[in-house]
């Protein structure tokens, strides 16, 4: 059994059982991957993949367990390399972050600017996607950190640390009837067409929950994953915008009126997560603390030692998180 064989079977699964696509991604040949997979199956005496002719059709029950363990083994191999790098070049390496557009556009720029200035030899890579894509990227080892708010149930296999609370604002054009009000009730908001986030992005679930709580149904006429797109369509008069407060900039958006909506919606919590098996380099600890100052190295280590995210939630229950 070779590490290369384990990497091949994991990557085949990552590429939806498409061996040709896997070969392209690994810069190797399709016959070479197929041969190594067969050799591993012969050595183990079981099929990892079910086949129809030359095509892989699904992962067998035994194969699912083998793939899970192979991921753990490869994660440990990466950890060994990280340990070596920490002792050889503590300020040199790479950092892969998976996050949403809102975090990348509004919450992270200052953090990343300071981080790059401090660690010029650390290459920083950002992957933007949906919460599901973010979870997959970190779970599969394609990203080191997940930074997200929505769909946190997808992250049960990760250590998730709370970073900050945030809430929403209503945005309208100056000639809109709501522009003259300093506060808006959810009943008043329900009377207008809404422009907001796509379900599963940037606290959208809390918007739906708030309307359900009031026994109302929101009239959502347009959704997008990007707050800048939402603001564009508010300017076009399509409806009333509901977006993260951090996405409203008085200097960049002088033609929009912002109304605080914290009385209507409960706050949401953004978290940073990583695989439990990840060896955190010194610069990774520093990135976490730059993003969330209360997450010192000692606090992170204490949280990692806990057995579940429920215990981590309890650990932070009495800690006041920053508000954005």
UniProtKB/Swiss-Prot annotation:
Coiled coil: none
InterPro entries from the UniProt entry: LysR_subst-bd, Tscrpt_reg_HTH_LysR, WH-like_DNA-bd_sf, WH_DNA-bd_sf
Alphabetized UniProt keyword annotations: Activator, Amino-acid biosynthesis, Cysteine biosynthesis, Cytoplasm, DNA-binding, Transcription, Transcription regulation
DNA-binding region: 19-38
PROSITE patterns: HTH_LYSR
Pfam name, any one: HTH_1
Gene3D superfamilies on file: Periplasmic binding protein-like II, Winged helix-like DNA-binding domain superfamily/Winged helix DNA-binding domain
Location in the cell: Cytoplasm
Main location: cytoplasm
Keyword Ubl conjugation: no
A single GO cellular-component term on record: cytoplasm
Example GO BP: cysteine biosynthetic process
Gene Ontology terms, MF aspect: DNA-binding transcription factor activity; transcription cis-regulatory region binding
Keyword Magnesium: no
Record family assignment: Belongs to the LysR transcriptional regulatory family.
Known function: This protein is a positive regulator of gene expression for the cysteine regulon, a system of 10 or more loci involved in the biosynthesis of L-cysteine from inorganic sulfate. The inducer for CysB is N-acetylserine. CysB inhibits its own transcription.
Assembly mode: Homotetramer.
Protein name: HTH-type transcriptional regulator CysB
Organism: Salmonella typhimurium (strain LT2 / SGSC1412 / ATCC 700720)
Gene that encodes the chain: cysB
């Amino acid at each position: 059994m070779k590490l290369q064989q384990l990497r091949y079977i994991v990557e085949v699964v990552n590429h939806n059982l498409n061996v040709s696509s896997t070969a392209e991604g690994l810069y190797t040949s399709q016959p070479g991957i197929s041969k190594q997979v067969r050799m591993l199956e012969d050595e183990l005496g079981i099929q990892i993949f079910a086949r129809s002719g030359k095509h892989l059709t699904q992962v067998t029950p035994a194969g699912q367990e083998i793939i899970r363990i192979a991921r753990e083994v490869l994660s440990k191999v990466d950890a060994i390399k990280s340990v070596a790098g920490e002792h050889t070049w503590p300020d040199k390496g790479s950092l892969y972050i998976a996050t949403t557009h809102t975090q990348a556009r509004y919450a992270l720029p200052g953090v990343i600017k300071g981080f790059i200035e401090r660690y010029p030899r650390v290459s920083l890579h950002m992957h933007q996607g949906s919460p599901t894509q973010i979870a997959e990227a970190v779970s599969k080892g394609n990203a080191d950190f997940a930074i997200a708010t929505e769909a946190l149930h997808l992250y049960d296999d990760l250590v998730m640390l709370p970073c900050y609370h945030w809430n929403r604002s209503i945005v309208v054009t100056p000639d809109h009837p709501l522009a003259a009000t300093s506060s808006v009730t959810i009943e008043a908001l329900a009377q207008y067409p809404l422009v907001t986030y796509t379900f599963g992005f940037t606290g959208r679930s809390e918007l739906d929950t708030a309307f359900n709580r009031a026994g109302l149904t929101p009239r959502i006429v347009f959704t997008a994953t990007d707050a800048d797109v939402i603001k564009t369509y508010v300017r076009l008069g399509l409806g009333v915008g509901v977006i993260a407060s951090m996405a409203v900039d008085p200097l960049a958006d002088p033609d929009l009126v912002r109304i605080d909506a914290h009385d209507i919606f409960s706050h949401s919590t953004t978290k940073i997560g990583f695989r439990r098996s990840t060896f955190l380099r010194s610069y990774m600890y520093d990135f976490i603390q730059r993003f969330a100052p209360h997450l010192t190295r000692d606090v992170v280590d204490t949280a990692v030692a806990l057995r579940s995210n429920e215990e981590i939630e309890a650990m932070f229950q009495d800690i006041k998180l920053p508000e954005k």
